[in-house]
């Protein structure tokens, strides 16, 4: 593969890492790989990046308190990072990133090693951040979650962009299997039944959408 990467119209190879980190934050697939291991509490762990940036103490406290609240982990602030569950640790990792106040957060399969409850915790936290205007880019293979929480979906195959559209449009494509993608279960059921929205001619992608169509028939709109 080849090409160029731009962030905010700036090619990244021309930008210092320190400056780029202030624009883009990355959350790893495995939260254990993101924990410094040098801090005794969750609060100190979130402060680590801010300390490296030389953020003034008062501003640092404000950002840490805000990120703890945003990720709903205030009650864990005095716990040791490695005493947290997988979902809690991933939320701590996200909190440490949003404390840096980046414009964009990139998440690399952040729920791949989490149980259903932990996955739901992370997706809800990410949704809250998105609603606050933070750009979220997530690589994820859990189709039901993508359908329920995404505004737009990129369909990739062998490193190439196939499509970029709303979840309903993406999962209603007839060639998904050719690209190694399995649509959400609700979408597959409605496809078998030939039930789709009248307005857009798309299959439902969430339980709520499927329930509405199955209850009211194809004349209903979603």
What are these regions (language model features)?
Residues 2-11, 20:
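Conserved ABC transporter NBD signature motif
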Residues 172-222:
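ABC ATPase nucleotide-binding domains
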């Amino acid at each position: 593969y080849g090409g160029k990467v731009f962030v905010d119209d700036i090619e990244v190879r021309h930008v210092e890492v320190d400056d780029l980190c202030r624009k883009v934050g990355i959350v790893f697939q495995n939260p254990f790989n993101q924990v410094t291991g040098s801090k005794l509490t969750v609060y100190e762990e979130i402060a680590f990046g801010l300390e490296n940036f030389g953020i003034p103490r008062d501003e640092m406290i404000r950002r840490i308190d805000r990120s703890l609240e945003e990720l709903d982990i205030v009650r864990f602030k005095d716990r040791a990072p490695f005493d947290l569950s997988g979902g809690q640790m991933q939320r701590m990792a996200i909190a440490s990133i949003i404390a840096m106040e980046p414009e964009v957060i990139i998440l690399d399969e952040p729920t791949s090693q989490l149980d259903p409850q932990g996955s739901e915790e992370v997706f809800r936290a990410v949704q809250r951040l998105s609603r606050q205007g933070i750009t979220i880019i997530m690589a994820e293979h859990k189709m039901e979650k993508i359908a329920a929480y995404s505004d737009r979906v990129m369909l990739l195959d062998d490193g190439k962009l196939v499509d970029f559209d709303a979840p309903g449009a993406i999962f209603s494509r007839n060639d998904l299997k050719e690209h190694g993608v399995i649509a959400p279960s609700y979408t597959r059921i409605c496809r078998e039944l030939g039930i789709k929205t009248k307005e857009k001619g798309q299959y439902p992608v969430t339980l709520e959408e499927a329930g509405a169509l199955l209850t009211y028939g194809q004349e209903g709109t979603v």
